[in-house]
């Protein structure tokens, strides 16, 4: 019986199979890298705000404590955004006529809040509580980076589940004394010794169950 296919068909079939496997692996790699990239996570992306507010100036230069503006960070899930009343406590006297602060003055006069652009935007299916993390010795800079050095706030961490779990599985690597939580420049001298001691002292558990963050 004569052959229907040319003998070169075997080689072509092998090339097709190997090529399909290669393309599949390549597409999977691209998908994983895209998922981790700033294009998807928003990491390192500066967002222009309605008011040119500089944390470097207010926190780094003037030494204003995080809690002066983010008043509920120790007591609630949300750290809280300051009302323009908080801004005007200082800016009634300082830069009172600056054109850059006109949106702040307008908000103060009308009572209409400034529509800030959210930088750290977690999915609706994820639950995060600032007060719990603060009480357990997780510093602001651990998640937000050196806010005191940012002219415009950007997302310093990827905020992916993998990133969160790195800390939840190994809290001793990241935890700090509670009195240093709001110290942006804090660096532990001996984290290998201090971390495990604080984990035990603060009763920190390695919580990795899905229901901890996803209700």
Question: What are these model-predicted stretches?
Answer:
Residues 1-52, 56-60, 64, 68, ...:
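N-terminal export/targeting leaders of redox proteins
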Residues 4-6, 94-126, 173-215:
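Primarily the internal scaffold of c-type cytochrome electron-transfer domains
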Residues 18-22, 90-95, 99:
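A short, flexible N-terminal coil/short beta segment enriched in small residues
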Residues 59, 88, 134:
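Nucleotide phosphate-binding site architecture
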Residues 63-72, 84-94, 140-146, 163-170, ...:
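The canonical Cys-X-X-Cys-His
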Residues 76-80, 97-101, 150-154, 174-177:
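Short Cys/His-rich "knuckle" micro-motifs
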Residues 124, 132-178:
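Soluble extracytoplasmic domains of inner/organellar membrane proteins
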């Amino acid at each position: 019986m004569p052959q229907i296919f040319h003998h070169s068909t075997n080689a072509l079939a092998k090339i097709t199979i190997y090529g399909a496997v290669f393309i599949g692996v390549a597409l999977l790699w691209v998908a994983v890298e895209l998922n981790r990239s700033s294009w998807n996570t928003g990491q390192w992306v500066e967002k222009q705000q309605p008011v040119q507010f500089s944390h470097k100036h207010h926190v780094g230069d003037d030494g204003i404590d995080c809690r002066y503006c983010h008043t509920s960070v120790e007591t609630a899930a949300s750290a809280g955004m300051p009302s323009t009343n908080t801004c005007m406590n200082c800016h009634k006297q300082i830069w009172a006529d600056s054109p850059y602060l006109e949106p702040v003055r307008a908000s103060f006069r009308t009572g209409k809040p400034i529509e800030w652009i959210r930088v750290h935007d977690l999915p609706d299916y994820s639950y995060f509580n600032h007060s719990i993390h603060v009480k357990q010795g997780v510093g602001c800079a651990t998640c937000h980076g050196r806010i005191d050095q940012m002219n415009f706030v950007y997302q310093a961490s990827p905020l992916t589940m993998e990133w969160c779990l790195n800390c939840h599985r190994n809290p001793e690597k990241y935890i700090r004394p509670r009195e240093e939580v709001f110290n942006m420049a804090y660096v532990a001298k001996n984290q290998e010794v201090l971390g495990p001691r604080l984990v035990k002292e603060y009763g920190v558990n390695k919580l990795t169950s899905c229901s901890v963050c996803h209700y």
